[in-house]
Amino acid sequence: MTVFVYDKTFEGLLTAVFDAYSRRSFPDLLLAEGEPFPLFYDEAVTICTDDAKVDRVWKGLQKRLSAMALSVITVTWLSELSETDMLLFRYIRKAIDAPRTIELNFGDPDVLEVSKVWKKVTNERLRVIQFLRFQKTADGTFFAAVKPVYLSLIHI
């Protein structure tokens, strides 16, 4: 079992994709720095985020995927659900390796799951926009308490 350890950022994930292709060895598990390792593993690789590698992977994805699919990837990342990083890693790997676009291949479980997570986040975004009510505080500022299920506030 190969484990990649990275900083749990989107840029770190794209760097992990680049490093996996350059090493020709793909991880079975992605962990954040400081997370405990599984009981049995063969190799642990520490990934250092590199902007040049991130740019190369992102430009490669721009050539293979539509702007909407790239948006789906970033919104899925913003959900911050557990195992989203490994799901996106597999999705990006399939997007790079496939001869045609995988965006609408809902027979693939990873594509379907990315689509489901994207739908959950965008539906929550719409609910926040529709039902958020502001109250005026004593000092005249407006305040609204929000407790999102998915961390999609950046996307609003």
Annotate each PLM feature.
Residues 134-142, 148:
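Residues lining hydrophobic/aromatic ligand-binding pockets adjacent to catalytic sites
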Residues 23, 125-127, 137-139:
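A generic structural signal for short, non-catalytic loop/turn and secondary-structure boundary residues
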Residues 1-51:
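N-terminal ordered "arm"
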Residues 5-6, 146-148:
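Short glycine-centered, acidic/aromatic-flanked micro-motifs in structured strand/loop junctions
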Residues 154-156:
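Conserved small/polar residues in nucleotide/adenosyl-binding loops
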Residues 44-129:
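Charged, alpha-helical interface segments at or near domain boundaries
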Residues 10-11, 150-152:
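Short acidic, S/G/P-rich loop/turn micro-motifs used as interaction or catalytic elements
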Residues 1-2, 129, 141:
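Short, surface-exposed beta-edge/turn micro-motifs
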